Amino acid sequence: MTFVLSSSIERLKEKIRTIPDFPRPGVMFKDITPAIGEGQFFRLILTIFIARYQKKKIDKIAAIDARGFIFAGALAHALGVGIIPIRKKGKLPYKTYELHYKSEYGEEVLTIHQDAISKGENILIVDDVLATGNTARTAALLVEKCGGNLMELGFLAELSNLKGRERLFPFPCYSILQF
């Protein structure tokens, strides 16, 4: 069984293409759309996430704008929990907390509704790719600001050379694929 899973993960990894100089020169963008565009690979991603998190006491899933939303809905449905959108500034209609940070693309602001998390709720954050870790770290800090207990940050892929995992310390993180 381990060999079959390992083989499937290698095929999944091959489905993620690298786009040079997107969205700006010098960035090697990991495009997940070929992987999520095929049912067998999208199902594999969700199956791996579900297996990892189904026995953990997660109350809600926080999804990072925008590709974190791709996994959050299906995963939340499978786990029977709600979703919290963590969005760019100006996208959430109610009272928000906001934090400024530097991304690989420039200055950014992430927001979360102030009432999205009850004190002590166990939160899983999901996103597509862990690159520098700055966006994910900001999302984790927003969860904490709301009073949530961050269980883990889960990613489809991690760009190990950018050392995002180091920037996330001490927050626990998991990635299905490493590049």
From Swiss-Prot:
InterPro entries: Ade_phspho_trans, PRibTrfase_dom, PRTase-like, UPRTase/APRTase. GO terms for cellular component: cytoplasm. It is found in: Cytoplasm. The keyword Glycosyltransferase applies. Pfam families: Pribosyltran. The keyword Iron does not apply. Keywords: Cytoplasm, Glycosyltransferase, Purine salvage, Transferase. Homodimer. HAMAP family: Aden_phosphoribosyltr (MF_00004). Belongs to the purine/pyrimidine phosphoribosyltransferase family. This is Adenine phosphoribosyltransferase. It comes from Methylacidiphilum infernorum (isolate V4) (Methylokorus infernorum (strain V4)). The gene is apt.
